[in-house]
Amino acid sequence: EETLTDAIATDEQAKEGVLVVLDKTPFYAEMGGQAADHGVITGAECVLRVQDVKKTPKGYYVHTCTLESGIVHVGDHLTARVDKEYRMAIARNHTATHLLQAALREVLGDHVHQAGSYQDASITHFDFTHFSAVTPEELVRVQKIVNDKIFESMNVTVKEMPIEEAKKLGAMALFGEKYGKVVRVVDIEGWSTEFCGGTHVKNTAQIGGFKIVSESSVAAGIRRSHRPQPADPCKPAGGYAAYRG
């Protein structure tokens, strides 16, 4: 669900940086390299604009808000609504990142693994292991593969399953990450299968298009590719490709 009603856990009269904790929330908190959802929280006497959400070590979701009107009190009942367009923009970038990793492995080799990533509504960065600069020709091949998969309109499925079952399917995990006995797996028709807790499109066609605008070294043996979110989701992102070792 994207709308839930609950009671908040703190009083606040400030206008900026208001922190709100709900018993339940439809908002995705920043984690796993994915930016948090945006949206609004409303009550009988207040309107709050949600600008960030973080999950504490104890499992509380803390919403950082701007109080646009009114005042909030302990015991108020609020309705939380996620900005669907903002979430979809992030989902496009996140699914595109999965396609990118699979394409990089196809072009550069199976030694390629994710070393870090970041996705918000505007951009995606993807850090990956590789022993040398990626050539312009290789990047063109990678980009074409990703766009081919987008235009093939491949279904994206999300399932929770025992970790051993996920491993048998060949699902890729983030190196160094600790997982429980049950994991969430994002699969793109068997072409890309990864452990992932983020938000995704339901079909690759929803991404619209893909263009790598830069590739560079960020550390020894670690490369970074960068891709902006297109202003028009039905068209590939514009920009240029820049390369440096």
Language model segments and positions:
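A glycine- and charged-residue-rich anion-binding loop/surface
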Residues: 1-245
